[in-house]
Curated annotation (Swiss-Prot):
The keyword Nucleotide-binding applies. It is found in: Cytoplasm. Belongs to the class-II aminoacyl-tRNA synthetase family. Type-1 seryl-tRNA synthetase subfamily. The gene is serS. One of its GO terms (molecular function) is ATP binding. It comes from the Bacteria. CDD domains: SerRS_core. Consists of two distinct domains, a catalytic core and a N-terminal extension that is involved in tRNA binding. ATP binds at residues 259-261, 346-349. L-serine binds at residues 228-230, 282, 380. This is Serine--tRNA ligase. Pathway: Aminoacyl-tRNA biosynthesis; selenocysteinyl-tRNA(Sec) biosynthesis; L-seryl-tRNA(Sec) from L-serine and tRNA(Sec): step 1/1. Pfam families: Seryl_tRNA_N, tRNA-synt_2b. One of its GO terms (cellular component) is cytoplasm.
C-alpha cells in the first residue's frame, strides 16, 4: 500500500510515479479529491479538539471563580457533538480512501526505465551459451520421450492442466529438491507452508482486492488456493515487529501454485508455459530498509546461478515501469533460452516491493525503540515446470530422448 502521508504531502510526486505504471488518471484524480477531503476534515476535527481543550481550561477557571458556566457548557456540548460528527465523517472517508488505495499499485523506483509494456524492457546481459544441434530442435510437447500427458490432464480437470509421468515426474521431483537445496546453501531457511490462504493474507501481499478474479476461491470459506508461495512466506510475519538484529530473514519454500490465468485466453495454449496448477520454489526476504538493495542483488544472482548450474542459457531483463507487477518497485526477470521455440521465455521474476507489502501486512522491525516498516522481496528460484521444459528443449537428442543435467543425476 502506498504511503497515505506521502500522498497527502506530495500528491503530484505520487501521481507522476504512478502514471509511469499506467494508472488511470480518473482513479488518481478521485484519489486526490478523497485524500484532500480527508485531510481537510481531519484538520477540522483537530481544530475542534483544540477549541475543546481551550474551553475545558476556561471551564475549570469558571468553576474555580464561581462564574456562570451555563453558556460555556452549551458551547462545550456543541463542540462535543460536532467532534463526534467529524470523527464519523473522517472514519468513513478514511475507509473509502483505504479501499481505493488497496487497488493502487506500488510506485516504481526512480531509476526504473520508463516504458509502456514488455517491448520496452531492457536486456541487461545474456549468460551462458545457446546449445547447438545437428538437427532441428523440437518444442517440448513434440518430443517423443513421452513425459507429458496433456489429454489425461484435461480429462482429470480441464484445459491448462497436465499430468506428468515416468521419468518426467521423477525429474520434476528432483528439480524441486535440487532448487530447495541450492537456496538453502545460499542462506535461505526452508519452510513448508499451507497451500491455502485467507483474504487478509492475500491482501497483505497485494493479490486482493484487485486480482480476485485470478484466484481460485474455496466456496463458502474465507480461503483461496495460493497463486505463489510469496503470499505465505511474506505473511508469516504479518502484523509482527521483528528485532533488527534478526534481519535479513531469507525464506524459501516449495508449493504448487494455482492461477485462473484470467485474460490469457489464446496465449500459450500448448505445453507447460501457462498452467492453472504448477510447481514453484520461491525465495522471500524481509529486510531493513538499508539492506534491501543488497539482498535484491543476492536473490537475482541466486536464481541466475541456479540456471547456470543446470547449463541453461538465460538473460537478465530489467522490467520497464509499464510492465512492473502490482506490488513491485523494481523487477529483474530471468528468461531462459528455449531452442524449440527459438526464443527466451520468463522463468523467474525477482522483485523488491520496498515497504509496499509491509505497510499492507504491518511487517515492522524495531530499531532504537522505533518501529520501522520492513522491505519485502520475492522471486522464483525457480518455476519448476518451466525449468523442466527448458531442460527438455535444451537437452533433447535427435531420437527425441532427453539427457539429464549432471547436477541432477544424484537426485534421480
Amino acid at each position: 500500500m502506498i504511503d497515505i502521508k506521502l500522498l497527502q504531502k506530495d500528491f503530484d510526486y505520487v501521481v507522476k510515479a504512478l502514471q509511469k505504471k499506467g494508472v488511470d488518471n480518473a482513479l488518481l484524480n478521485n484519489l486526490k479529491d478523497l485524500a484532500l477531503k480527508t485531510k481537510q476534515k481531519r484538520q477540522e476535527m483537530e481544530d475542534v479538539t483544540a477549541e475543546q481543550n481551550l474551553l475545558s481550561k476556561e471551564f475549570g477557571r469558571y468553576k474555580k471563580e464561581n462564574l456562570d458556566i451555563s453558556e460555556l457548557q452549551e458551547k462545550i456540548n456543541a463542540l462535543k457533538t460536532k467532534k463526534q460528527e467529524l470523527e464519523d465523517e473522517v472514519r468513513t472517508l478514511e475507509d473509502d480512501l483505504n479501499s481505493i488505495i488497496l487497488s493502487v499499485p506500488n510506485m516504481p523506483d526512480e531509476n526504473v526505465p520508463f516504458g509502456v509494456d514488455e517491448n520496452e524492457n531492457v536486456i541487461l546481459e545474456v549468460i551462458g551459451e545457446k546449445p547447438t544441434f545437428n538437427f532441428t530442435p523440437k518444442e517440448h510437447w513434440d518430443l517423443s520421450c513421452d513425459w507429458l500427458d496433456f489429454e489425461r490432464g484435461v480429462k482429470l480437470a480441464k484445459s491448462r492442466f497436465t499430468a506428468i509421468k515416468g521419468d518426467g515426474a521423477r525429474l520434476e521431483r528432483a528439480l524441486i529438491n535440487y532448487m530447495l537445496d541450492f537456496n538453502r546453501q545460499r542462506g535461505f531457511n526452508e519452510w513448508y507452508v499451507p497451500f491455502m490462504a485467507n483474504s487478509n493474507t492475500l491482501q497483505g501481499t497485494g493479490q486482493l482486492p484487485k486480482f480476485a478474479d485470478d484466484l481460485f476461491k474455496i466456496e463458502g470459506e474465507d480461503l483461496y488456493l495460493i497463486p505463489t508461495a510469496e503470499v505465505s512466506l511474506t505473511n508469516l510475519y504479518n502484523d509482527e515487529i521483528i528485532d533488527k538484529s534478526e534481519l535479513p530473514l531469507l525464506l524459501t519454500s516449495y508449493t504448487p501454485c494455482f492461477r485462473k490465468e484470467a485474460g490469457s485466453a489464446g496465449r500459450d495454449t500448448r505445453g507447460l508455459i501457462r498452467q492453472h496448477q504448477f510447481d514453484k520454489v520461491e525465495m522471500v526476504a524481509i529486510t531493513s530498509q538499508e539492506q534491501s538493495d543488497e539482498i535484491f542483488e543476492k536473490m537475482v544472482n541466486c536464481a541466475s546461478d541456479l540456471l547456470s548450474s543446470l547449463g541453461l542459457c538465460h538473460q537478465k531483463v530489467q522490467l520497464c515501469s509499464g510492465d512492473l507487477g502490482f506490488s513491485a518497485a523494481v523487477t529483474i526477470d530471468l528468461e531462459v533460452w528455449l531452442p524449440g521455440q527459438n526464443k527466451f521465455r520468463e522463468i523467474s521474476s525477482i522483485s523488491n516491493t520496498r515497504d509496499f507489502q509491509a505497510r499492507r501486512a504491518k511487517i515492522r522491525y524495531k530499531e532504537d525503540k522505533k518501529n520501522i516498516l520492513a522491505h519485502t522481496l520475492n522471486g522464483s528460484s525457480l518455476a519448476v515446470g518451466r525449468t523442466l521444459l527448458a531442460i527438455m528443449e535444451n537437452y533433447q537428442q535427435a531420437d527425441g530422448s532427453v539427457k539429464i543435467p549432471e547436477v541432477l543425476k544424484k537426485y534421480l
